[in-house]
Amino acid sequence: MKIPVSGISALNRSLLQIKGPDATKFLNGLSTSRFLPNIVKKKQHTIDEAENRHAKLSEIININDNWGLMHEDIYDPDNNIFVRRDGLNSMFLSSKGRVVTDCFLYSQPFHNLNGTFEGQISEPTYLIEIDSSFTSQLQMLLKLHKLSAKVSIETIKSMHSYYYYNDTAEFDEYLDFIQQEFFRSRDPVDALNNANSFIKSEVLFNPKLAGNILGFSIDNRIPNFGIKVLMDKEIGDDDNKIPVDDLFSSSFKDNFVVPEILKPESITRRRFMNGLFETQDSPKESSLLPFEMNLDLTNGLSLEKGCYVGQELTIRTYNNGIIRKRIVPIQFFEINDDNLSALDESEYLTLDPNDPVIRELQDLHSSTLSKLEITPLIEKKDSPPPEPEQQSSSPFANSKPVRRRTASSGKLLSIQDNLGFVLANLSDIENVDLYKIELPCLEGGVKHVGIKVFKPEWWPID
């Protein structure tokens, strides 16, 4: 099955507003992204000119103003930090360094073209966009750490989150142009001017809807993966909604087809096809680390921001330079010669909602996924046979030999049609990409289903 080349869809998201004089400090202490302009070197024993390049950020950014957000990529060799008004990917962690939820963070408002949002730009204001299933959990975390901070925490129900993508080479180049032209500012004044120019230029949106566009982000978790836009009105065909044709500018429509409105499932399927995991994909009781969720590869982590909740384990892992497990995409298949031959030649995930293997998976409850054993489909022939157990001379010893369970090669986290995600040992998948899982059968015994592990092509080359 192929999803449409382009499309736009509403997302099941909640938006929390953090507003007040201490909003910048407050979020800096809780999220994995940098909000304060001071630099805390990730390796104190080194002297690196690149790490000192932004020492004057504290002179440029006044944290008591509505100044924007800092965008950075920890793997950028130039160590660029851009001050921008558009949103970015981030996470909130527990005190033990485990992921509470991933999110997108926005400065509010995104723009102030013609003074449209003049009344809202007087003090630091941010929006946190999360999957709706994590709203209560994140609210509790924020309120727990609020203490005497001068911030208000409010759920915003009047905004709607939309995701647009276009999987053509032309749009990929178009997004490169947009970012180069409007989103490389290094101070708050330029950031706001560029955001205003972006709306006014009609390069993407209809400027007549400037007052309806409350937030904007380029999704660079995967380079140029799509765009996100926060609206104060719904998009659709009903009389009280904004027609999708009206959202985009004339110049945009001269170059690209007006997208069809898709269901959120299409956005989810596209993520699975591209190996992009989100917190809600795994069971609620999952306990994951940010590096396991590839946060460092999706532009959601700052290493020079100082202390924040969950920071100690995260920075220690980075400094040790050893990441043993990561979440990787997989494709399920029925184990037979035809499938093995086809998958042996396949370099990309193939979504097929009609794959017969789905019948074997559909009755699995999410809480049982991580308990399923994953082992190599073909055992290594050169593996030495297990040594026989030494018989104890004790008369009280158990004479029955003990069967030692082989260690599972990973943990199954989620299933979408015939695709899914596994938390895998990187050392295992370097050498083996075909595995099997044991599924319990109602008739008794077990049934095996095949898994092929894929390393996303957007991962950096080792």
Swiss-Prot record:
<dbReference type="GO" id="GO:0016226">
    <property type="term" value="P:iron-sulfur cluster assembly"/>
</dbReference>
<dbReference type="InterPro" id="IPR045179">
    <property type="entry name" value="YgfZ/GcvT"/>
</dbReference>
<feature type="transit peptide" description="Mitochondrion">
    <location>
        <begin position="1"/>
        <end position="43"/>
    </location>
</feature>
<dbReference type="InterPro" id="IPR027266">
    <property type="entry name" value="TrmE/GcvT_dom1"/>
</dbReference>
<feature type="region of interest" description="Disordered">
    <location>
        <begin position="378"/>
        <end position="402"/>
    </location>
</feature>
<dbReference type="GO" id="GO:0005759">
    <property type="term" value="C:mitochondrial matrix"/>
</dbReference>
<keyword id="KW-0809">Transit peptide</keyword>
<dbReference type="GO" id="GO:0016740">
    <property type="term" value="F:transferase activity"/>
</dbReference>
<keyword id="KW-0496">Mitochondrion</keyword>
<protein>
    <recommendedName>
        <fullName>Iron-sulfur cluster assembly factor IBA57 homolog, mitochondrial</fullName>
    </recommendedName>
</protein>
<comment type="similarity">
    <text>Belongs to the GcvT family. CAF17/IBA57 subfamily.</text>
</comment>
<dbReference type="InterPro" id="IPR017703">
    <property type="entry name" value="YgfZ/GcvT_CS"/>
</dbReference>
